[in-house]
Amino acid sequence: MADSKQSNRDWAADDVDADELPPTTESTDANGITTIVSWKYNADDQKVKVTRRVRRRLQVSTVTQTMAERKQWPKFGLDKGKPPGPDRKTTIIGENLHFKIAPISKIQRVEPEPETAVKAPTGKAVVCRLCSGQHYTARCPFREQLAAIDNLNADGAEEEQVVVSGTLAAKGAGETGGKYVPPSQRAGATGAGDSMFRARDELPTLRVTSLSIDAEEDDLRALFQPFAKNGKLGRANIVRDRNTRVSKGLAFVSFESKRDAEAAMAHLNGRGYDSLILEVAWSQPRGERT
């Protein structure tokens, strides 16, 4: 009876051992090639023998101290207790990607996607009055730059001189009748009040015509900057079309020193620039043009 129980127990143990996979074995031959034999189950639940031959070579690399310390950390999780190095059962070895930081100047700027057309409540497309973009004028990103030269594009790109007539000045000498009267029109006033643009109007300004439409403000400054020896170069603006922003071949350049402006006019007037002959002359107020 005891022999029968012992035989039954051995039969069950043999059945359990038959379902287990044999252990993985490794062997190295005289040529240094390691043969790794492992077992696995395929899709049909059959045992499959996998043989891999690997040639191992010692490769020495220099790493930082912190990286060397991380390699000494004990493994955890599914790799706990396993030898150093990646285990193919739990680790996917990919391609090494080398990260290189490029200078900011060499990074290509990503072109912004074209804005979708903004429509007004009436259903019409909204067009900016400054840059003709499809957005409201109040939200134009170039509002400050374009608004600063709107007066130049109006008619000749110069400010008008405000002249107060004698009758208007005399009118302010009487009774105001409870209404606000500007200081320039009050009793005892000699003329117009101070203007914010007085310092700008008093600068010696040159009018440049026959300018290439491809020239930019930076090119204009580079052309006139060498003559600014007694003072700084003031404004250098190119008159552009209000809608297309294309140059009209007209520009205005101001100097702090009249002597510098005269030298620039004498040297550049009639000079060839970008296949055109420049015409440089004094800029005259709108009322004095001929």
UniProtKB/Swiss-Prot annotation:
Source organism, top-level taxon: Eukaryota
GO biological process: formation of cytoplasmic translation initiation complex; translation reinitiation; translational termination
A cellular-component GO term for this protein: eukaryotic translation initiation factor 3 complex, eIF3m
Pfam family, one: eIF3g
Bias (Basic and acidic residues): 1-12
Key word Cytoplasm present: yes
Compartments it resides in: Cytoplasm
Residues covered by region (Disordered): 1-30, 173-192
Keywords: Cytoplasm, Initiation factor, Protein biosynthesis, RNA-binding
InterPro entries: eIF3_g (IPR017334), eIF3g_N (IPR024675), eIF3G_RRM (IPR034240), Nucleotide-bd_a/b_plait_sf (IPR012677), RBD_domain_sf (IPR035979), RRM_dom (IPR000504)
Coiled coil regions in record: none
Domain RRM: 204-285
MF annotations from Gene Ontology: RNA binding; translation initiation factor activity
Stored PANTHER family: EUKARYOTIC TRANSLATION INITIATION FACTOR 3 SUBUNIT G (PTHR10352)
Function: RNA-binding component of the eukaryotic translation initiation factor 3 (eIF-3) complex, which is involved in protein synthesis of a specialized repertoire of mRNAs and, together with other initiation factors, stimulates binding of mRNA and methionyl-tRNAi to the 40S ribosome. The eIF-3 complex specifically targets and initiates translation of a subset of mRNAs involved in cell proliferation. This subunit can bind 18S rRNA.
Family indicated by similarity: Belongs to the eIF-3 subunit G family.
Official protein name in the record: Eukaryotic translation initiation factor 3 subunit G
Native organism: Cryptococcus neoformans var. neoformans serotype D (strain JEC21 / ATCC MYA-565) (Filobasidiella neoformans)
Gene name linked to the record: TIF35
